[in-house]
Amino acid sequence: MAWRRVLSQLARSRPASTIYNELITSRPSWLLRGDVNGGGTLKNLNERYQSSFVGSLARRVQNLDVPSEASLLKEIYKSDPERVIQIFESQPWLHSNRLALSEYVKALVKVDRLDDSTLLKTLRRGMAVSGGEGERVGSSSALKSAGQATKDGILGTANAPIHMVTSETGHFKDQIWRTFRSLALTFLVISGIGALIEDRGISKGLGLSQEVQPIMDSKTKFSDVKGVDEAKAELEEIVHYLRDPKRFTHLGGKLPKGVLLVGPPGTGKTMLARAVAGEAGVPFFSCSGSEFEEMFVGVGARRVRDLFAAAKKRSPCIIFMDEIDAIGGSRNPKDQQYMRMTLNQLLVELDGFKQNEGIIVIAATNFPQSLDKALVRPGRFDRHIVVPNPDVEGRRQILESHMLKVLKSDDVDLMIIARGTPGFSGADLANLVNVAALKAAMDGAKAVTMNDLEYAKDRIMMGSERKSAVISDESRKLTAYHEGGHALVAIHTEGARPVHKATIVPRGRTLGMVSQLPEKDETSFSRKQMLAWLDVSMAGRVAEELIFGDSEVTSGASSDFQNATKMARAMVTKYGMSKQLGFVSYNYEDDGKSMSTETRLLIEQEVKSLLENAYNNAKTILTKHSKEHHVLAQALLEHETLTGAQIKKILAQANSTQQQQEHAVEAPRKTPAAPSSPAASAAAAAAATAAAAAKQAAAKAKGVAGIGS
């Protein structure tokens, strides 16, 4: 602001011509090159220099002829400079009068509004445009032209107009466009560089340029595999062939090229393949079906070729493909071409024009029905070995194998655990042992006990206990009688599975549960077993009706009815156990829509008859053994969880107490008539004996240990 004050003082004290000549002759070059340097401060100085110069131009013509308007403005200026500014800006025809312009500039300087004048800024831009030659050669030429025009008296006339330049309204849009154009160009450059790198390094990035390396030393042996003796026996032939191929080929025979291991998850298919490699002592190539697919077309087929090429160099060897159904699924004409390329290449490598000698391919899958028929035909996968879930002896062996790594107490009986885990796979048994070990560690025990194994088994089979669930006393009592009815009918029904455990502790989605386990592995079920299963299923609802009445039954038996109906319908439609329908199998998967109305009606009548008979049988048993039912329910309310052995012990004690009471009542009836005093003594003695027996039974019942509490 200092330079502006200097110009204001000069305007008041010196003639305009002198100021103009001094500015023109002594102007510094750095003021005229403000645009070149680009600094914000220099640019402002240049603009303000031009503004002051315009004021000097106006004051330059003070000694010329003064019209009446200019004289009037001069007189007004002495008393009211603001009025001069208002008059000049409101009268456009005064803008061409040099004397009036001089008075206007002096008034702006007087009131210190020189920088805020819109009119002066417009005049300054007009001088810059009219004096420029192309792209802003310099501010000095504009100032010279403006000064010369002022000297000649033609500034603001028709021959030398004041040009108006408006700022571009599309400046922001142009900036956005330039930014977008720069980003697009950058993206194209990066994409091009990436494509070049990808073209040269895609094989290295996807691992295609690296040769597949086998596992040379497999530590797994057949002795480590338990519970699948039949599968091990079939795979031993492969081991003998890999050890001595000439033994089998000198007679003209050919060993199978491929072995397909089929079975449920967790049965040890992968472990069997590793055991084959460990026993034979040959290189072992392992891969998964999903590893062949990639986002790039043709990568899967390329990887199959690389795998078999590496295997040929190390023949004899084993190639193991886990989850082969990922690439070996049945082909569909609607599938994309790249989806079939991998499978086609695998088919060619297994049995194509070029024979692969000494390469044994072992594949594993859980869904053999989904594989392509061309893949499983003889010549590719000649042998299909089923690896089922282990039987009771196999489960015991698997448990022993896993328990070798765990500290166990002397009370552990693995045969009991094996018998109580039907349908468990090897992976399930390994998980059971691990859960038991973690439970023992959490309890601070020094070894895994039988209770830990039982806890792990119940947690896997029945779900975790929900002891924090808030249940009313009425609901607990109803659940105890409901589950007690199931257990009691199972004990007194011929053909029913033995009761393993009864509990009223909520597990999973149930409020209580009675677990029944077979004494041995079962491959089929008899009619007697199925009818007994129906009786046990109906016992829960029967118990609720007998104890609480018809109006107090609950929805807790819904799952029992659903399972019983499913079993009864299977007996009628699948197993030929209905005299009315005969030995005919009916497809009921479509809800009977494929059958006639008469047939469906007959099936439903037979199913209803089976369920009604089961209901009546359960009602007869619970009515006959009502006292045992009450004792068992009270024991469940007290201990919450009871094992099968504990339930039998409680029922035996209840029966013994009842028999003693019956004998005590019948004894006086059989005794001959005697004097009143001896008879009274005998009666008192019998009553005392009965009371003592009842007290003893109650004490023994309280001594039963609760497992789930």
Curated annotation (Swiss-Prot):
GO cellular component: chloroplast; membrane; mitochondrion
NCBIfam families: FtsH_fam
SUPFAM superfamilies found in the cross-reference section: FtsH protease domain-like, P-loop containing nucleoside triphosphate hydrolases
Keyword Cell inner membrane: no
GO biological process: protein import into chloroplast stroma; proteolysis
Transit peptide residues according to the UniProt entry: 1-15
SMART domains: AAA
MF terms (GO), sorted A to Z: ATP binding; ATP hydrolysis activity; ATP-dependent peptidase activity; metal ion binding; metalloendopeptidase activity
Record's protein name: ATP-dependent zinc metalloprotease FTSH 4, mitochondrial
Active-site residues, as the UniProt record annotates them: E483
Cofactor(s) recorded in Swiss-Prot or TrEMBL: Zn(2+)
Assigned keywords, A-Z: ATP-binding, Hydrolase, Metal-binding, Metalloprotease, Mitochondrion, Nucleotide-binding, Protease, Transit peptide, Zinc
Record EC number: 3.4.24.-
Low complexity bias locations: 670-682
Cofactor binding description: Binds 1 zinc ion per subunit.
Role this protein plays: Probable ATP-dependent zinc metallopeptidase.
Region (Disordered) location: 655-682
Annotated binding of Zn(2+), by residue: H482, H486, D560
Protein's cellular compartments: Mitochondrion
Keyword Nucleotide-binding annotated: yes
Matching Gene3D superfamilies: 1.10.8.60, P-loop containing nucleotide triphosphate hydrolases, Peptidase M41
Sequence similarity: In the N-terminal section; belongs to the AAA ATPase family. In the C-terminal section; belongs to the peptidase M41 family.
